Amino acid sequence: MLEAKHIALIEEAARLGHANIAQLRLCFQLLSVSAAIDRDCATRLAPHGLSEGRFIVLFLLHGAGGTLPPHELAERAGVSRATISGLLDGLQREGLLQRRSDAEDGRRLQIVLTARGKRLADDLFNQHTQWIGGLFDGLDGAEQVQLSRLLAKVWQHTDSGRSSQP
């Protein structure tokens, strides 16, 4: 499961006599699982001409009833306005969304899913959620709860986790 770079780092840490080899291995296992999920996700979305970012934009638009202003899409996706602009350009070229003037304020834009974009969002969201659910088929309910708790505990010791605590 470990990638070659992680094995090399563990071997070097062991050679240098570091005592936290087990923790390094756990971290690298977590990183390897995450990387595998990212690769699998990219492989599943690529035939549709989608990156994860584009998929998230489709999903957010679909969940909002098919229409949102670009700044709100950027905020919900957690990306900059420049990034959302690039994602929207690509999705528009593919015919999955359109930019339209706001009916109440013609200076503002609304991003609107096309019928093709809505169909793709419907299909992919169902496929994607089933695939993600299948990743945890080997864990019973109690194990899933335990894993969630353990991951939350690890997250609390990351810089992001510490900075989000009151």
Regions found by a protein language model. Give the residues of each.
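C-terminal regulatory/oligomerization modules of transcriptional regulators
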Residues: 1-19, 142-166
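N-terminal leader segment of winged-helix/HTH proteins
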Residues: 1-48
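Short alpha-helical "packing" element that flanks the helix-turn-helix/winged-helix DNA-binding module
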Residues: 54-58
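Short capping segments at the starts of secondary-structure elements
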Residues: 64-69
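A short acidic, leucine-rich amphipathic alpha-helix
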Residues: 72-74
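Key DNA-contact positions within bacterial/archaeal DNA-binding proteins
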Residues: 82
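Charged, amphipathic alpha-helical coiled-coil/dimerization segments
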Residues: 89-149
